[in-house]
Curated annotation (Swiss-Prot):
EC numbers, comma separated: 2.8.1.-
Cofactor note: Binds 1 [4Fe-4S] cluster per subunit. The cluster is chelated by three Cys residues, the fourth Fe has a free coordination site that may bind a sulfur atom transferred from the persulfide of IscS.
Pathway assignment: tRNA modification
Gene3D superfamilies: HUPs
Keyword Cytoplasm part of the UniProt annotation: yes
GO process annotations (BP): tRNA thio-modification
Ranges spanned by the short sequence motif PP-loop motif, renumbered to the chain: 45-50
Species this chain originates from: Shewanella pealeana (strain ATCC 700345 / ANG-SQ1)
UniProt protein name: tRNA-cytidine(32) 2-sulfurtransferase
């Protein structure tokens, strides 16, 4: 920690750690993220999220009923001004196994992306490829990334608004080649809790804008939208995330998710709730013809007064 905390701050930090530990533990259980004997490669960027993820995973490792190994890995992408000593010094204090990799993806990105454009997308793809390869080299069975609940929701709206897809970040993902399993232990955690916890813990944060890349304006706009919703409608973000876990393909319009083409009614199926006509209650009759005023006749019934069948 960078400075002494007050008793109130210590209490708050303990409460946040317990909350994050509970949420991470629940996510791990719900999605079977970590199993007996796993070697978990914990990817560190030097930001608040990955620091918090490592901290909570190390805490859970001491309490978990299963045995698993944690290996911290950072990729130095040779961005100008990257402080090479910060992460090794911090990791040494934890006593956790770690690797610092070096690969000049910065030069590749600057060569491919026009000046003034955001480089984050290409940078992350190059970083992901390097980390996937290293995970196989060290025999990692899981690759842990620090994306949290807000990242997942933001990604869903970004894909909805700008890509025409209902797609987010899954808590657990098998790579396209089937060789790597990616997990997101912070999937249930709120960013504001992580930020507050990181500040209280005094993690040595490394800025993410050393490359000089412009902020992703679309993501920033979606993030601000969600921040305002959270202020104006408490509980809405939680409801959105709950909805993401309760999809109903048969109630949507995606033909790939549900087989509408072969959907057929069963002519032999009994009518649902079939009762004798004499047992049917009277229906209220609604008349909206009187200048928009609604008149209810509680005694009125709906009767079939005539039918016509064309020959």
């Amino acid at each position: 920690m960078s400075e002494e905390l007050t008793p109130q701050q210590v209490t708050r930090m303990t409460k946040l750690q317990k909350r994050l530990r509970t949420e991470v533990g629940r996510a791990i259980g719900d999605y079977n993220m970590i199993e007996e004997g796993d070697r978990v490669m914990c990817c560190l960027s030097g930001g608040k999220d990955s620091y918090a993820m490592l901290d909570i995973l190390l805490n859970l490792q001491q309490r978990a009923p299963i045995k698993f190994e944690i290996v911290a890995v950072n990729l130095d992408q040779k961005q100008p001004g990257f402080p090479e000593d910060i992460l090794p010094a911090y990791l040494d204090t934890l006593g956790v196994a770690y690797h610092i990799l070096e690969k000049d993806t910065y030069s590749i990105v600057k060569d491919k992306i026009p000046e003034g454009k955001t480089t984050c997308s290409l940078c992350s793809r190059l970083r992901r490829g390097t980390l996937y390869g290293f995970a196989q080299k060290i025999g990692a069975t899981k690759i842990a990334l620090g994306h949290h609940r807000d990242d997942i929701i933001e990604t869903m709206f970004l894909n909805m608004f700008f890509a025409g897809k209902m797609k987010a970040m899954p808590p657990k993902l098998l790579s396209d080649d089937g060789a790597n399993m990616v997990i997101r232990p912070l999937a249930y955690a709120r960013e504001k809790d992580i930020a507050e916890y990181a500040a209280l813990k005094g993690f040595p944060i490394i800025p993410c804008n050393l490359c000089g890349s412009q902020e992703n304006l679309k993501r920033a706009a979606v993030k601000e939208m969600l921040v305002q919703w959270d202020k104006q409608h408490p509980g809405r973000i939680e409801t959105i995330f709950t909805a993401m876990q309760n999809t109903a393909p048969s109630q949507g319009v995606d033909r790939e998710q549900f087989d509408f083409l072969s959907l057929q009614r069963d002519p032999d199926a009994p009518m649902s709730g079939q009762v004798a006509e004499s047992d049917l209650p009277a229906f209220d009759f609604v008349d909206v013809s009187n200048n928009g005023h609604i008149n209810l006749d509680a005694a009125a019934r709906i009767d079939v007064v005539s039918t016509y069948t064309p020959e």
